[in-house]
């Protein structure tokens, strides 16, 4: 019986993959000793791939932001939208009294906020810090006016994000689809790839990746996932 032939290209690829994984494991082990595991100082928001992907998502739906808008603390996108003619009001929401919050309430149950109060809700990397996110998506649905829109991003892979009041969840597109299943229309997005996703716990910033790598999106292993959901 003849021995099966092995194509040189496949063999080289297998060897390269094995060597890469070996070297990566060594470098990650070394990183435990020399990596500072913190964000660069002087940036707000911090220039992470996740923040880049949030901007990419909001850019896609930029023209849909209108009417009475609310954003959850910190209001990174207030300057982007406030002052536009199509924006009639802009609230900032926090769970505790703070500046510049105009609404103080628990998103899981906010009876002081009326039904149909908003036309657009900006919820960027908030649900991961909410103990019962299904209650939050239900409340956002209640607070939206008919035809209103939630623009929501969540991490799929991320280091400890914001421990106050808690850091509870990471999400997939399937979990977002379930959380927003009561909305009339849902559009899901995923951003990032295994390189940017694995770089997150290493505190790698956008400048650590080439533009080609940063803007390559692999739905199997993204950094963040997002949803545009209409009432």
Model-derived features: where do they sit?
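Conserved SAM-binding loop
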Residues: 61, 67-162, 227-229
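Internal hydrophobic scaffold segments of catalytic domains
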Residues: 3-18, 47-48, 171, 177-189
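Conserved SAM-binding loop and adjacent beta-strand
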Residues: 43-54
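Acidic/glycine-enriched edge-of-secondary-structure segments
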Residues: 38-45, 94-96
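Membrane-proximal basic amphipathic "stem/tether" segments
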Residues: 1-42, 224
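S-adenosyl-L-methionine-dependent methyltransferase catalytic module, highlighting the catalytic core
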Residues: 134-135, 139, 146-231
């Amino acid at each position: 019986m003849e021995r099966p032939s092995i194509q040189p290209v496949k063999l080289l690829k297998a060897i390269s993959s094995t060597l890469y994984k070996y070297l990566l494991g060594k470098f990650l082990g070394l990183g435990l000793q020399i990596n500072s595991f913190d964000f660069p100082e002087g940036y707000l928001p911090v220039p992470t791939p996740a923040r880049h992907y949030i901007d990419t998502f909001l850019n896609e739906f930029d023209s849909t932001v209108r009417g009475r808008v609310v954003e959850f603390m910190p209001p990174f996108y207030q300057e982007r939208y406030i002052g536009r003619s199509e924006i009639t009001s802009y609230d900032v929401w926090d769970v505790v009294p703070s500046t510049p919050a105009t609404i103080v309430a628990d998103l899981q149950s906010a009876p002081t906020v009326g039904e149909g109060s908003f036309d657009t809700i900006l919820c960027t990397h908030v649900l991961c810090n909410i103990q019962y996110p299904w209650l939050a998506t239900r409340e956002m649905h209640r607070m939206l006016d008919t035809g209103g829109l939630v623009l929501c991003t969540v991490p799929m892979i991320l280091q400890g994000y914001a421990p106050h009041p808690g850091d509870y969840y990471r999400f997939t597109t399937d979990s977002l689809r379930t959380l927003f299943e009561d909305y009339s229309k849902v559009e899901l997005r995923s951003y990032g790839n295994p390189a940017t996703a694995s770089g997150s716990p290493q505190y790698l910033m956008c400048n650590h990746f080439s533009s080609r790598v940063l803007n390559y999106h692999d739905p199997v292993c993204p950094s963040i996932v997002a949803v545009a959901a209409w009432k």
